[in-house]
A protein has these predicted regions:
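A conserved beta-strand element that flanks and buttresses the S-adenosyl-L-methionine
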Residues: 46-50
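Core SAM-dependent methyltransferase catalytic element
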Residues: 122-147
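Class I SAM-dependent methyltransferase SAM/SAH-binding core
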Residues: 1-32
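Short, glycine-/aromatic-enriched active-site segment of Class I SAM-dependent methyltransferases
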Residues: 87-105
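Short conserved loop adjoining the S-adenosyl-L-methionine
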Residues: 32-41
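Short alpha-helix
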Residues: 106-123
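A short glycine-rich, Lys/Arg-flanked "PGG" loop and its adjoining helix->strand segment in the class I
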Residues: 61-74
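Conserved beta-strand signature within the Rossmann-like core of class I S-adenosyl-L-methionine
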Residues: 74-83
Length: 147
């Protein structure tokens, strides 16, 4: 996460749950390919949750996914989320202004197909998907192909 507050609270939660041996929460830039790729030790599972839909630029998403593909071992997994639509887009845009200098943060709703194509182009094969009963949120699982 890029927020010191989120890193502090996330690390505290990991410790509170007794997961220090298997998890950590670090500060970083999810859209900096080299930074993501440098994850050490190399993860067997990468998770991107509630992030890509907040940014309109597919080049940013491509860089992030390319870094994930470099970081995650072949045969490892990527869990990623999507929001193909949302009934409260205007409310969300007006509420999420902290990272945009007070400007509205308009959610980029990618179709599931578009998101899956970005994941595939990065070197992952989609295996499964779940969607909530309202069709708002998706969670997908993909496996890192051998380069």
């Amino acid at each position: 996460d890029f927020s010191d507050i989120n890193v502090r609270d996330g690390a505290a939660l990991i410790h509170q749950k007794g997961l220090d041996a298997i998890a950590r929460f670090e500060k970083g830039d999810a859209f900096d390919q080299a930074s993501v790729a440098a994850a050490s030790p190399r993860p067997t599972v990468g998770i991107v949750s509630g992030l890509y839909e907040l940014f309109p630029d597919n080049d940013m998403v491509r860089r992030s996914l390319a870094g994930m593909a470099q970081a995650v071992e072949p045969g490892g997994y990527l869990l990623y989320t999507g929001q193909p639509w949302h009934p409260q887009l205007e409310l969300i845009a007006r509420a999420l202004t902290s990272h945009r200098g007070g400007q509205a943060w308009v959610m980029r709703r990618r179709s599931q197909s578009e998101m899956d194509q970005l994941v595939d182009a990065a070197g992952f094969e989609k295996l499964a998907q779940r969607i909530d009963e309202w069709g708002i949120f998706t969670v997908s699982l993909a496996r890192r192909r051998n380069p």
